[in-house]
Amino acid sequence: AGPGPGQIRAAASAYGGEHWPAAADLPLPNPNSSVALPRLQSGRLLIAGNGAGNRNQLLLWLSDDAGKNWRLTRTVESDADDLVEFSYPALLQSRDGRIHLAYTWRRQGIKHAVFSEAWLDGGPP
């Protein structure tokens, strides 16, 4: 999270990680928690993270323009109880194109969800 209230900070290296620009705030909410951000095989960027306030939501945002603009595409988990937590997401896309999301579920276990990139755009999982 960034220095402002509930900000995600990000930087991208065009030099294989040898040189980095200054990090910038993304216009996405974040309650000082970890996020996952892979580049999909299509070239789009996907973020899994929590919404504003607490960790009682797990959300997916998608960027079609290398991170300049983001849109909320799916709510994976949501609970009205602020003490419920869905956290520490990890994302990867397997060779077959399926996207795998693993995260801590209610501090009781690890949940694993598998879905297609089309699901992010409103299609079937």
Stretches found by the model and what they are:
Residues 1-125:
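Asp-box/BNR beta-propeller blade signature and adjacent active/binding-site loops
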